[in-house]
């Protein structure tokens, strides 16, 4: 017996309403569970201090409203972003962990060891092998993307053997419970000192050498070099690998006392996982045991992490000397060495948030200049005073007696509150910047009597090659006794010229 057409439509409509309602309900439940805050409280199923009792990697279609383990789904906490990212747009994958509601040391069964064996993928889809027992002490798992990524955070380590493969290599990393979780941004700010003090015990050491690296533009998977020069070097030129090779050679050649990274470590708009890119960018300094400080650029926070989150990761990495700061921006701090120097790092931020009032780039703000004035009052008797920026001031390109090349117009904020005038009044005679990749000159401003210096871009992931530009880095040698700064550059190409000191000049401060 055939149902009347009206009954069929009514039946389908009821089913459609039920399906839509179920879809929305599952979506709401999934979203609510994923927004539960994982805290660093002392204990509990959503505490970073409670050992993990199980781990799962869950895959689903992009349109699926519910993408988590089904059994006891309310107990699982998501600990990764979508691991497929843009590689496979119709699929999603997440790492989940489960912690016991009641943890009894020595009795509760936990995850004791995790390793990845791609040979076992057929038996276990992702090759993840887990050993359980009552001695488990893993409190956190993370994922990093890319074949050349490394885990640098203090106390963290990669799980053994192999990568998980989800359209790209995924490195699974772990934190044992004996390593405390990273404090929140607010807690880090509360603990911060007003400056970072660098001490040099060698009494015979007369000079301090600083390597300035700017605009490295790291991503996740290795991409072809952008604008390589000379053009014959383009074949098989992979951006991140070539940048790292250049940085390693500079560290070997110069043996700097510390490294200043003046912005755009990450090519945020092409980096699917900023944490992985950031660790890759600073790994050479950890390998060579060279302290470093990061001044963020306008590209660093264009990916999936904010400046605050990037600063939080840096706080966990050995050798990182930066601070978050308590004024506008992230990363306003002083590097100070008694009787030697005071280096003032200012966050020039990125694109403006109010394009009508201030189109283009954001500006240094009045509270930053007030902070700078207060810090100069603390350290004004140090022989060498320097300011560090990413985005230059317009006065950089009003300088005279240039040593180096002026290849592109300056990119600067049109809303700057006259920072150059403040530098003059505070008697800071030298300011350095990045951002303009193919400008690499030092010059003196005729009105302010301040030296402004560009580093030039060092990374192959950002633009370059204009006017025959070869990637390079700048070196500063500070002589506190003579109150002098000697500076030069090192070129990446040709190999036989890498040991040549280009455009050597001495700046009396």
From Swiss-Prot:
**Where does the sequence pass through the membrane?**
none
Where it sits in the cell: the answer is: Endoplasmic reticulum
Q: Name one GO biological process term.
A: endoplasmic reticulum unfolded protein response
Listed Gene3D superfamilies: 3.60.21.10
Q: Which residues form the signal peptide?
A: 1-32
Molecular function (GO) terms for this protein are: phosphoprotein phosphatase activity
Quote the InterPro entries the UniProt record gives: Calcineurin-like_PHP_ApaH, Metallo-depent_PP-like
**Which keywords describe this protein according to UniProt?**
Endoplasmic reticulum, Signal
List GO terms (cellular component aspect): endoplasmic reticulum
Q: What is this protein called?
A: Uncharacterized protein C1020.05
